[in-house]
Amino acid sequence: EAYAFGL
């Protein structure tokens, strides 16, 4: 869920 951290 890296997208949740904007990575």
From Swiss-Prot:
The modification Leucine amide is found at L7. GO terms for biological process: neuropeptide signaling pathway. Keywords: Amidation, Neuropeptide, Secreted. One of its GO terms (cellular component) is extracellular region. It comes from the Eukaryota. It is found in: Secreted. Belongs to the allatostatin family. May act as a neurotransmitter or neuromodulator. This is Carcinustatin-2. It comes from Carcinus maenas.
